[in-house]
Amino acid sequence: MEDDDRPRKYPKLNHDEVQEGSEPVMTGAVGAVHDDDAESADSDNRASPSNDRIDNDVKQACDEEGQDAHGKDGPPTLSKNQLKKLKRKEHWEAMREQRKVKRKEKLVAKRERRRAALEQAKQEGAEATEETRKAFESTQKKFQRSTLLPVTLVLDCSYDDLMLDKERVSLGAQITRSYSDNSRAPFRSHLVVSSFNKLLKERFDTVLGKTHENWKGVRFLQEDFAEAAEMAKEWMQGPKGGQLAGVFADKADAKPEDGEIVYLSSDSPNILTELKPYSTYIIGGLVDKNRHKGICYKSAVAKGIKTAKLPIGEYIQMAHRQVLATNHVVEIMIRWLELGDWGKAFIQVIPQRKGGKLKSADHESEDQTPRESVEAVEAEPDGEGAAAEAGEGGKE
């Protein structure tokens, strides 16, 4: 056969053998490859694996740095986690009106239960009616009947930047519950929220609608816990500093200079045995799922402040580690001011899921089921409903 009669061979692609007389095929190609484009197609095909890796690396870097793959000047991109958070936030905002409706429905149901309970009490007599009325008193009326003692509880919120958004939301709900419990207690303390100057304050000012500005008997300070404790010495000695009543009734000779400042921490080697008049007790406002163990204790030691832990191990057999939420610690302290008994205070406050049981036989006759109401903070992790309720009570 003459050379001119032989069919022209097509160039091989990807080193694959092509049968003579057959049409060359490229994997993934849509149309035929012309002679002029064969060489460039072959080059592009060989370079694609490395290009894919480069694109992936660039995309990953952009996700980390918030930059677009086309350059630093491009619009920022979001990672998958950021997109999920954004969607959850959008969903949360979209459901705001529905949550408001549900809160109103709960309020109506609560009023109906109150009315039914009063009707039932009237049938049982005047004494039962009076007890029922007291049980349903508003926060303001309970606050007016409550006796202020010369003791201060400081919630240290200086760890704002160490928490995740959801943890900050949880802390906001715990502060709300702490305020509510203290306001309704028969014997209440001075309550202070220190280092209230970061993202937590922003949440209270925006999402929670500044309802905390209507709260009574609580101070929100930008100063840290050490400065707040020094300020507490002055107002506890003032004309509205509180009475030596309740558990302090037998300490009429107590002097302001005998008071102390104690930072409560489960990491402390010291055990708190009692609360003293004209003293300030600091509680770490930190929700961190054990990422920053011992940080509250270290903060107190660094400022030369005494530390102590609640005597939980002396009275309660715990199934889990002895770390409680901020509002639980506050309520335990308030219960002690009312009862003067750590065992009773612990068993009334510590959540049942922590498996707490009294060690002492002297308390076996007491109700060993912790109150369900302390779980309300976790039932409403957003804290919006709790803050609204507390704000409403403060304005009445």
UniProtKB/Swiss-Prot annotation:
What broad class of enzyme is this?
transferase
Q: What is its EC number?
A: 2.1.1.221
Q: Which reaction does it catalyse?
A: guanosine(9) in tRNA + S-adenosyl-L-methionine = N(1)-methylguanosine(9) in tRNA + S-adenosyl-L-homocysteine + H(+)
Q: Which residues bind S-adenosyl-L-methionine?
A: L264, S265, G284, D288, K289, N290, R291, H292, C296, L310, Q322, V323, L324
Q: Which GO terms describe its cellular component?
A: cytoplasm; nucleus
User: InterPro entries in the record, alphabetically?
Assistant: MT_TRM10-typ (IPR028564), MT_TRM10-typ_sf (IPR038459), tRNA_m1G_MeTrfase_euk (IPR007356), tRNA_MeTrfase_TRMD/TRM10 (IPR016009)
Q: Cellular location of this protein?
A: Cytoplasm; Nucleus
Where's it mainly located? cytoplasm
Per the UniProt record, one Pfam family is: tRNA_m1G_MT
In terms of domain of life, where is this protein from? Answer: Eukaryota
SAM-dependent MTase TRM10-type domain location is 139-357
Q: For bias kind Basic and acidic residues, which ranges apply? A: 1-18, 52-73, 359-374
Q: Where is this region: Disordered?
A: 1-109, 354-396
One GO molecular function term? tRNA binding
Keywords from UniProt, A to Z, are:
Cytoplasm, Methyltransferase, Nucleus, S-adenosyl-L-methionine, Transferase, tRNA processing
Mention one GO biological process in which this protein takes part, according to its record: tRNA N1-guanine methylation
Q: Where is the active site?
A: D288 (proton acceptor)
Task: Give the family per the record.
Answer: Belongs to the class IV-like SAM-binding methyltransferase superfamily. TRM10 family.
Query: Which PANTHER family does this UniProt record tie to the protein?
Result: TRNA (GUANINE-9-) METHYLTRANSFERASE, TRNA METHYLTRANSFERASE 10 HOMOLOG A
Q: How does it assemble?
A: Monomer.
**UniProt function note:** S-adenosyl-L-methionine-dependent guanine N(1)-methyltransferase that catalyzes the formation of N(1)-methylguanine at position 9 (m1G9) in cytoplasmic tRNA.
Name the record gives this protein: tRNA (guanine(9)-N1)-methyltransferase
Q: Its encoding gene is what? A: trm10
